[in-house]
């Protein structure tokens, strides 16, 4: 059981990876209040160098790039499945994250890995690798 999430902070062109076993379904609530609150929440976790979950186990993830002022994420039980609610949430999030480019990670953890320069294909479940190619 769990709602596994990968939490990443990019700063000074380096990536710090953190892990939370229980926050994927509520990740949206931790991000809502802006970058300071989000970064504080992420840094309360122990760093997990090189700890990437694959696309089967990762149920939510966030990457906050403090240098480029970008937020890339997916997760949150309601906004993941209710698209109209997600649209409203993202509009509200833009007000709380002034100056940041906010993006939904439509391909899950592989979008974050790709952004960070990590081998995103290694995070795909082997049974899926042969069936599709993410372009």
PLM region descriptions:
Residues 1-2:
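A short catalytic or substrate-binding loop motif that flags glycine-/basic-rich loops and adjacent residues
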Residues 36-135:
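Low-complexity intrinsically disordered segments
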Residues 14-47:
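Short, flexible N-terminal segments of the mature chain
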Residues 10-14, 66-67:
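Short acidic-glycine loop/turn motifs at beta-strand connectors
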Residues 5-9:
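Short beta-strand scaffold segments in enzyme catalytic cores
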